[in-house]
Amino acid sequence: MANSDDDDAFLYSDEEQEVEKQGPKVKRVKFADEESNKEEDKTNEKEQQQQKQEASNSESGSGSGSESDSGSESDDDIDIIIRDTQPTKSKSSGTTIIGNEALSEMTDPEESTSSSSTTAAAGTTTINKRQSSSTINLESVPRYQQEEDGEGDGTLITQLDIETLKLKPWRAPGVDVSDYFNYGFDEFTWLAYCHKQDKLRGEFNPQKVMENIMKGPGGAVGANGTNGINLGDKTGQQQQQQQQQQQQQQQQQPPQPPMGMMMPPPGFMANMPMPPMGSMPPMPNMANMPNMANMPNMANMPPPPPGFNGQFPAPYNIPHTMNQKQ
């Protein structure tokens, strides 16, 4: 055992002495003052991490240089310096510049609307100019004129007689009639349409139509365009009210008597007394009335007059049987 201890001491004594001379290896880490900023956003944290990595790389490079110069320090001696990175003013100014540029790129809505309105107005003016520059009159009736065949004297197309034309290509077999007549017309319906249009244009009188419209259900049209009454004037309204009142009174009054008869005073028939039935005077010759033939005797009936034989003179002497036959 002693020999083994001696051998170990002989072999490893030099290394232990060198370790004691050199001392324990210490890792030196330098920390700068850290100030915590909890309000930083995620973008600043990423930038801090990048800066930490760059600082560690730079410090590792400087440490390796010192170790190579001294030769006494090993690769384990690493100096790490952590710096407190704060957002600089340049970054804030950069953000403000970006905001200003973005604001400068934005346009004023009023200016944009005004520019669009001006362009729209310009467009409408150009359209109006184009419409005004057109020489085609849509209300005019075209005239027939064909210079190639030497036909046509400028007559209206509605008054043109088709039979006078030399060429009638629409009558050829297999020809499409729509190539010569529009809107579904053919030769016969076109002629009927032309005659109808000429008749309507001849009978049409705008002034007469307006008079009929202005008359309405009333009478003749006055000078002011109404039925003899100026509705805009107060006197005209009063006259109209008086006419309505007169019409109502006429409807309420009883009918007038015929010509030559006097109208009884009002309330005459209502206040007129009627005579009593018992006080009527007796009629003359009522008591001496004769008894008629085949008449049953009635109670309280007076006797017939003297000399009456029961027969009436002609033409009142008709037998009773003849009256029944008739």
Curated annotation (Swiss-Prot):
Keywords: mRNA processing, Nucleus. Residues 1-138, 215-267, 302-326 are annotated as: Disordered. InterPro entries: Fip1_dom (IPR007854), Pre-mRNA_3'-end_processing_reg (IPR051187). Belongs to the FIP1 family. Residues 30-49 have a biased composition (Basic and acidic residues). The lineage of its organism: Eukaryota, Fungi, Dikarya, Ascomycota, Saccharomycotina. This is Pre-mRNA polyadenylation factor FIP1. Residues 254-267 have a biased composition (Pro residues). Residues 50-69, 112-126, 236-253 have a biased composition (Low complexity). Pfam families: Fip1.
